[in-house]
């Protein structure tokens, strides 16, 4: 790391760091990864361009938090902020005679983002493909048809949300389980609300111990701070985080049985094979990272190639498949299935890619590059010294988990990785856990909670979630205590 901290006389500013900490701290907690965000040769933390950069990012994030009211995509403000921040850095470094330093820092930050972009793009494509092949609809229909009691349904949707979120994003998982609850709940608002809270907590907890469960865990794994198999040490704490509030809430659910509903859903052709290809892709990406020391994105992109070949096979063989099914259904007199063949459309991989959450991916770029710029100016190194030197890392990580209930956990984790604190594996696992499950404390603390407020509008609300916040907080504390107890040895391990 270059730490010369030279600053041209025309950049010096009378304001000093302690007074600026009040403004900078909340901003930098909102920020991302960019391992290239190490402080540059020039210390710009007390300069006018530095103050402008922080103000730009703060203003952009205020607009992001007002996304619902402004009806403006969250990627817009951070994309502009990232461009302006790096433009100022480039201008300063060119005038200081150091153009290569800023170019190299930008390129390294962009490379880190690109690897994550490719990984997430493939994962989203597979999830979209499984959704289009009706894999999730089939699961929902199966749950609806079984006629489980309310208490059983509460536990089944929670447990499924916990495990599905280890490979699928918590947003998809939560909305799938909420759809089941809304279908069978017969307008029981209390039951719907408790199930929504349970699903949000479960999906966030499930993603906390899997490298594929959340963007935050993916980044910790890709940064080689925690090895793939080491994440599973968080399984016990994550289960405790989910089970403590779930057990308490289940006591308030009447054990009556709703009427069984009949819903016929057929998997589209190739659905099971796409699920298998997704699992194979995950295995390949893990092997690339652990055995070949190559980025996981390589394995994911290879898996995308497999999906494209399989999509080609589905398209080429579709006419023959339709003809065989028409003959079979006609002979059996199954007119319902015969009629459904008229709506069959060919599988197209690029349509699934186009349906990825591009606003999220572009927002991700804006935050990564913005914080990469702020880190290159020297702010993250300064904050790291304040937070992780002034405090015990355990307490710092617990507090940052609480911060993630208000601020999206992706920027929180990115900020920590960018600070590069010297922490044990146990502490890296701790921040992974707290940043992952801290969002459950408030309904707005995770994408799952925000989505369910819209899906169960007027039933699951910010206030209804807050009423159970003490129980959720109890689960948060219990999960931290369990981690400190059962994984005590990991706090002596440094990678």
Curated annotation (Swiss-Prot):
It is found in: Cell inner membrane. InterPro entries: Cit_transptr-like_dom, NhaD-like. One of its GO terms (cellular component) is plasma membrane. It is a multi-pass membrane protein. One of its GO terms (molecular function) is antiporter activity. Its main location: membrane. Pfam families: CitMHS. The chain crosses the membrane at residues 17-37, 46-66, 78-98, 110-130, 153-173, 191-211, 233-253, 274-294, 295-315, 361-381, 398-418, 428-448, 468-488. Keywords: Antiport, Cell inner membrane, Cell membrane, Ion transport, Membrane, Sodium, Sodium transport, Transmembrane, Transmembrane helix, Transport. Induction: Induced by hyperosmotic shock. One of its GO terms (biological process) is sodium ion transport. Coiled coil: none annotated. Na(+)/H(+) antiporter that imports sodium into the cell in exchange for protons. Can also transport lithium. May be involved in adaptation to marine habitats. PANTHER family: SODIUM/PROTON ANTIPORTER 1-RELATED (PTHR43269), SODIUM_PROTON ANTIPORTER 1-RELATED (PTHR43269:SF2). Belongs to the NhaD Na(+)/H(+) (TC 2.A.62) antiporter family. This is Na(+)/H(+) antiporter NhaD. It comes from Halomonas elongata (strain ATCC 33173 / DSM 2581 / NBRC 15536 / NCIMB 2198 / 1H9). The gene is nhaD.
């Amino acid at each position: 790391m270059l730490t010369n901290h030279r600053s041209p006389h025309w950049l010096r500013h009378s304001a000093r760091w302690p007074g600026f900490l009040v403004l900078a701290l909340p901003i930098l907690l909102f920020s991302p990864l960019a391992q290239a965000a190490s402080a540059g040769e020039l210390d710009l933390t007390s300069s006018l361009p530095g103050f402008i950069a922080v103000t730009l990012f703060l203003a952009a994030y205020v607009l992001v938090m007002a996304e619902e009211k402004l009806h403006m995509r969250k990627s817009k403000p951070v994309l502009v902020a990232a461009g302006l921040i790096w433009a100022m850095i480039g201008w300063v470094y060119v005038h200081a005679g150091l153009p290569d330093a800023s170019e190299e820092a930008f390129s390294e930050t962009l490379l880190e983002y690109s690897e994550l972009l490719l990984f997430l793009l493939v994962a989203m494509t597979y999830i979209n493909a499984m959704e289009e092949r009706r894999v999730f609809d089939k699961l929902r229909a199966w749950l609806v048809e079984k006629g489980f009691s309310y208490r059983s349904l509460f536990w089944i949707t929670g447990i499924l949300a916990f495990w599905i979120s280890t490979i699928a994003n918590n947003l998809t998982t939560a909305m799938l389980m909420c759809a089941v609850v809304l279908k069978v709940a017969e307008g029981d608002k209390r039951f719907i609300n408790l199930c929504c809270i349970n699903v949000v907590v479960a999906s966030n907890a499930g993603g906390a111990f899997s490298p594929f469960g959340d963007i935050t865990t993916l980044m910790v794994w890709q940064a080689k701070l925690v090895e793939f198999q080491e994440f599973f040490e968080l399984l016990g704490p994550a289960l405790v985080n989910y089970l403590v509030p779930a057990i308490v809430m289940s006591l308030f659910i009447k054990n009556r049985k709703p009427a069984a509903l009949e819903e016929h859903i057929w998997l589209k052709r190739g659905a099971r094979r796409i699920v298998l290809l997704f699992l194979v892709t995950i295995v390949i990406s893990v092997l690339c990272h652990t055995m070949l020391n190559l980025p996981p994105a390589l394995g994911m992109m290879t898996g995308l190639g497999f999906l494209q070949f399989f999509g080609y096979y589905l398209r080429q063989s579709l006419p023959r498949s339709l003809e065989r099914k028409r003959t079979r259904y006609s002979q059996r007199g199954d007119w319902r299935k015969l009629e459904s063949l008229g709506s069959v459309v060919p599988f197209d991989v690029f349509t699934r890619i186009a349906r990825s959450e591009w606003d999220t991916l572009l927002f991700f770029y804006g935050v990564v590059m913005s914080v990469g710029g702020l880190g290159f100016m020297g702010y993250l190194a300064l904050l790291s010294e304040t937070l992780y030197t002034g405090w015990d890392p355990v307490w710092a990580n617990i507090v940052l988990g609480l911060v993630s209930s208000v601020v999206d956990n992706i920027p929180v984790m990115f900020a920590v990785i960018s600070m590069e604190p010297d922490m044990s594996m146990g502490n890296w696992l701790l921040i992974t856990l707290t940043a992952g499950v801290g969002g459950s404390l408030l309904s707005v603390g995770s994408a799952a909670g925000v989505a369910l407020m819209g899906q169960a509008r007027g039933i699951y609300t910010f206030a209804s979630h807050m009423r159970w916040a003490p129980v959720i907080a109890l689960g948060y504390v219990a999960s931290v205590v369990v981690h400190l107890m059962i994984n005590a040895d990991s706090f002596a391990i440094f990678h």
